[in-house]
Amino acid sequence: MKMNVTATVSHALGHWPRILPALGIQVLKNRHQPCPVCGGSDRFRFDDREGRGTWYCNQCGAGDGLKLVEKVFGVSPSDAAAKVAAVTGSLPPADPAVTTAAVDETDAARKNAAALAQTLMAKTRTGTGNAYLTRKGFPGRECRMLTGTHRAGGVSWRAGDLVVPLYDDSGELVNLQLISADGRKRTLKGGQVRGTCHTLEGQNQAGKRLWIAEGYATALTVHHLTGETVMVALSSVNLLSLASLARQKHPACQIVLAADRDLSGDGQKKAAAAADACEGVVALPPVFGDWNDAFTQYGGEATRKAIYDAIRPPAESPFDTMSEAEFSAMSTSEKAMRIYEHYGEALAVDANGQLLSRYENGVWKVLPPQDFARDVAGLFQRLRAPFSSGKVASVVDTLKLIIPQQEAPSRRLIGFRNGVLDTQNGTFHPHSPSHWMRTLCDVDFTPPVDGETLETHAPAFWRWLDRAAGGRAEKRDVILAALFMVLANRYDWQLFLEVTGPGGSGKSIMAEIATLLAGEDNATSATIETLESPRERAALTGFSLIRLPDQEKWSGDGAGLKAITGGDAVSVDPKYRDAYSTHIPAVILAVNNNPMRFTDRSGGVSRRRVIIHFPEQIAPQERDPQLKDKITRELAVIVRHLMQKFSDPMLARSLLQSQQNSDEALNIKRDADPTFDFIGYLETLPQTSGMYMGNASIIPRNYRKYLYHAYLAYMEANGYRNVLSLKMFGLGLPVMLKEYGLNYEKRHTKQGIQTNLTLKEESYGDWLPKCDDPTTA
């Protein structure tokens, strides 16, 4: 049965308590319960006023039954109507008597709540030291508190809990808000909320400015810091109604909405809509949360300044008020200052004093020199002031000497559209010019939902992760540990990551995810030669992630790599500047089809190297060209999961260390290093009664008696030419055995150095020469 939206809503009138459960949306009328949209444990209430399926949630807002279906299923109004129509087709039209009864029931509930409010208010006492207000920073604030117990909203309220009386527009007490010591809040069952408020009267700016705040603690904070009148709306849902009423009562007042800054953006949107309705302004706190959160974090003076900064109108451009004569009479430095003011003092110059950047929407964007020069020329033209290219260049060059110098972005910050995440402590902050962010992830950081998992809430990332790990849980944990190392910038673990595998196995996605976690500003690409060269190392300073793509052809001892990952100071010799020594505190991530080959036998590389192999090559038809973009949109979930999973960072470190000597890593090293592969054919004996070391001059060779002879035979049998000298073989042997978990022992005898090593049985079939001569056997 096809129905339009209006007809569906009309047909559903009075039936929502049956319709919603039929769609899988469980609701209980007039009970605080988990929100079916955001998952909040007790912030949702279904009141079904006038049979319209009405509801409200402190986080999601309010609406009717159709709006709830839209939000739960994430569909358009027409699609929501189709879902509702599918279960209402057989229902009879709503009986007008039922609707009238619902209205009467609502009126009766309001009257009962108002009467109960009067009764409870008569049993309150005025006092100080309320536990909730003390926690909010106001231990000396006089307030109304319960003198006995009361049951409301599924909560047992105790003596001493805070009571906030709510009045309608006629000044009549119609409801109460009860607030416990731990911050639980309820109003009386069936009581009026929309259009009600509690007012904190102030003396300052009386009749000139009026504040509206969401919660009581926020209102108390604003009132305390400004001395001005503040109305308490209780929630963002009531802001619009209260703002309209305030404008009717106070037509000449400036109305300011002291809104909450929510991660979801809901508080900001509701406040903006209310401000539009009353021609008011919105004042957002400098933290995520409310103005009381800012007060408790930064103190009174800083928060008072932030409040007045938030309502200060934007400064006019001096070019709107100056005359041509005034501007022309100015010195070059004065003209540069006026231009700086025109741009809202949101300009900075790079460390070299050449490139200008402008702060916009959370990031410092580089201004192309020619474009900026044309903009400055446009300001001259606006005033009809004479100019030349030389004059414009002179003003721009002078401006570069006046404005602040751009700093490097903090390594611990990851930028999102709606703020920055501090990866050291997991806190999320609003954007600030002082963060010096140059790029942002083009997604919003979102609040967690109950039961959040990677599999459900980051499906694209999960598919990549599970495929890269071959479906093995322990391998997934290792990959996540590597990503956490990048996220937390744990260069101090003295490890470096090497991801290997065939083309199309997901290695590049690993590098892209690592870049997102480190932040685009904090990541750079290089070659391993860059790490080894003092001249080229200058390009690596200031980054927290160094990517080394496609390094498999490189072969060397990795001295620079060892020094950087070991936390040693390395020499840097930049062009046209004096050489110096510095630490490069960065995580190094190499991405190769084949593992790198190191000639170092001291163990300096092996004890820092973590190899993660992606064995499966994804078929071309299965590859998703949009995978990176999809994972980018899931970044907030990924970050939360990593920080929660590795709340003890040492768990991630131990996983990476266990990966170093895993069978997978050993097999990769064996494929890359023939000497290391040969060591895999050795096993230890309880005593030093095994093979002798031998040397190259002993003739004839005895491959079962002399270890060095066996090594030469292995290299020859497999066609390898570059064999190690006896000395280098002897030096590297203990280190390589240790990677296999074997202890090397030796003793000096008359026949030479005897070891505790012997050849494994598989040596005879794989490469050991077959000879019937017992002297060579």
Swiss-Prot record:
Catalytic reactions of this protein: ATP + H2O = ADP + phosphate + H(+)
Keywords: ATP-binding, DNA replication, DNA-binding, DNA-directed RNA polymerase, Helicase, Hydrolase, Metal-binding, Nucleotide-binding, Nucleotidyltransferase, Primosome, Transcription, Transferase, Zinc, Zinc-finger
Pfam families given in the database record: D5_N (PF08706), DUF5906 (PF19263), Pox_D5 (PF03288), Toprim_3 (PF13362), Zn_Ribbon_Prim (PF08273)
GO terms (BP aspect): DNA replication, synthesis of primer
Zn finger region (CHC2-type): 35-60
UniProt cross-references to SUPFAM superfamilies, sorted A to Z: P-loop containing nucleoside triphosphate hydrolases, Winged helix' DNA-binding domain, Zinc beta-ribbon
GO CC field: DNA-directed RNA polymerase complex
Positions contributing to ATP binding: G501, P502, G503, G504, S505, G506, K507, S508
UniProt EC number: 2.7.7.-, 3.6.4.12
Record-annotated Toprim domain positions: 208-296
Span of domain SF3 helicase: 474-627
GO molecular function terms listed in the Swiss-Prot or TrEMBL record: ATP binding; ATP hydrolysis activity; DNA binding; DNA-directed RNA polymerase activity; helicase activity; zinc ion binding
Alphabetized PROSITE patterns for the sequence: SF3_HELICASE_1, TOPRIM
UniProt-listed InterPro entries: DNA_primase/NTPase_C, DNA_primase_Znf_CHC2, Helicase_SF3_DNA-vir, NrS-1_pol-like_helicase, P-loop_NTPase, Phage/plasmid_primase_P4_C, Phage_T7_Gp4_N, TOPRIM_DnaG/twinkle
Role this protein plays: This protein acts as a DNA primase generating di- to pentaribonucleotides; the predominant product being the dimer pppApG. It complexes specifically to the P4 origin of replication (ori) and its cis replication region (crr). It also acts as a DNA helicase.
Subunit structure: Homohexamer.
Name the record gives this protein: Putative P4-specific DNA primase
Lineage, highest ranks first: Viruses, Duplodnaviria, Heunggongvirae, Uroviricota, Caudoviricetes
Gene: Alpha
